[in-house]
């Protein structure tokens, strides 16, 4: 039996209120419903629609199994979310090299979480999406997206989640009036190494709008 590792780290937080009427349905559906109606699109769907067949096949090939990227990502995201919520967590000890360095990342010290895996929506585009975290550090409000890689060497080569962060920035502005995000960051966790990549707000917005434009022209008019 693989050993389990227990973590606890309570935060005192003042969280943003969830968006009224917005619900997320996870695996296997991965869909959002807003005020009783299903949203036709998700951020993931928009960004993945023009993924090259070779890359899509590679992702599918390495997705499944106890050491696949889905199991790894789910486990590490769960610990990260529970940590920010101030809840204890238990995880398979094989993920400790990722988790230990992630939770020791200097950026994540002395922060105040505002939202953790809290769904957002753009009601005009009818798209739902969920940032991993929105938090305060110093005078800045961050939107953070967590990515995991299988090997330590992959941390440095992993790109920032530019269009994804741009989507969350847009959604947060419409869902949480008066909350002005000033920093966008991709947190990349590997075994024994963690790296943060910052994105310019304007570039992230442009990347998201470009992705949405390519996607939306292929969709039927309702």
Predicted regions and their residues:
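Mg2+/Mn2+-dependent nuclease catalytic core
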Residues: 114, 118-222
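Metal-dependent nuclease catalytic cores that hydrolyze phosphodiester bonds in DNA/RNA
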Residues: 1-128
């Amino acid at each position: 039996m693989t050993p389990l590792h227990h973590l606890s780290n309570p935060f005192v937080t003042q969280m943003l209120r969830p968006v009224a009427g917005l619900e997320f349905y996870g695996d296997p559906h991965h869909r959002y419903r807003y005020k009783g109606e299903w949203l036709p699109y998700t951020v993931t769907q928009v960004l993945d629609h023009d993924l090259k067949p070779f890359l899509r096949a590679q992702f599918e090939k390495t997705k499944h199994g106890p050491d696949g990227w889905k199991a790894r990502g789910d486990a590490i995201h769960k610990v990260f979310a529970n940590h920010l919520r101030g809840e204890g967590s238990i995880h398979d000890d094989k993920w400790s090299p990722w988790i230990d360095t992630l939770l020791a990342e200097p950026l994540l010290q002395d922060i105040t979480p505002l939202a953790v895996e809290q769904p957002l929506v753009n009601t005009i585009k009818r798209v739902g999406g969920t940032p991993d975290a929105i938090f305060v550090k110093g005078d800045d409000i961050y939107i953070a997206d967590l990515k995991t890689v299988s090997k330590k060497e992959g941390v440095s080569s992993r790109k920032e989640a530019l269009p994804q962060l741009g989507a969350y920035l847009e959604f947060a502005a419409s869902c949480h009036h008066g909350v002005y995000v000033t920093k966008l960051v991709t947190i990349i966790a590997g075994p024994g190494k963690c790296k943060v990549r910052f994105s310019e707000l304007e570039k992230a917005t442009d990347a998201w709008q470009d992705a949405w434009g390519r996607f939306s022209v292929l969709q039927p008019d309702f």
